[in-house]
Amino acid sequence: MTIHRRIEHPFERALSVSMEEIEIALRGMRKAPWAEFTLNPRRLRGSDFLMRWSQGVWSEDRLTDAVNSAGKYFAMPYGPSGTAPDNDVRAFELYFERLEKAGLGNIKRPDLLVFRVADKARVDSTVNQLNGPSELPFTAEEDGRMQELLAHAVVAVECENSLWRAKQMPNYTTPLTPQKRLGGRLGLKKGAVLPTIIIKEEDRDPLRTWERHRKIPIHIWHAFFDEAYGISLSDAEKLISSGDIEPTKQVFQAPGGATTEKVIYKIYYTHGYLLATTTEEPKLIADSITDRNGHILPYVRFVGGKSRLSAEASAVLDSMR
């Protein structure tokens, strides 16, 4: 397999799929004509990007609902992946095309902002002045209205998700033990399979810069099918800097089929906090999309499901700002 290094379009970056997450691989096939799919301006391959889109929408919605249902805080989409249309993949693509044409495609912002319910009226008023959440990525953060919005944020969130049942992963309960490769520090064998909170190397510097400039703490929230976990960016950085968490190279496939090798950090869930627990599982519904040439592409869509914010996560939010 040839790995191409190139500048990614924001649409491709948002929907790139880790090869580890693709369950069905067609090996030995250079080209599968039936997998070609024309969306709007670009030609795509396979349905994995549709699964990624549906999975991303579902996981962010589930975490947002968990925060909102707890009653003390509320979450709102902020970065492009959250503010883009969530019910039409064509509209999703065109949203990122518009972002790219505006010269904003490579601007990194956290996916969600979390506020206190006590500030909801002021936050809603400010967002309405900015023409709604979908327009936030097109407005400079130096704008006075954006400054007003950010002044009320308790925490900013970068969202990740994985198609795994966390509790069924083989090393879910395996205790950390001294590891030779880590200089005697606690860890697990390299091949251990357990829930991890993932941060990409390419995101580290932009997120650190944003956190420093905006003076709002960033947390990474990672949703699995049955549980979700969180960790602060500052704690993640300490684990990476100390060598407790090693870099891992992983291949990602973009919707158009191109592959890119990226460095990521898989932080053991035990280093973070339990964010939420699934109380009602989503349904996996068969769906399809028809391209402009009449080609039908089937995929599985995530529908419904509920999660409850943990007491530990509530305490983390209470401790901020």
Per-range role (PLM):
Residues 82-84, 162-164, 225-228:
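Short, solvent-exposed loop/turn segments at secondary-structure junctions
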Residues 1-108:
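Interdomain/boundary linker segments immediately adjacent to catalytic/signaling cores
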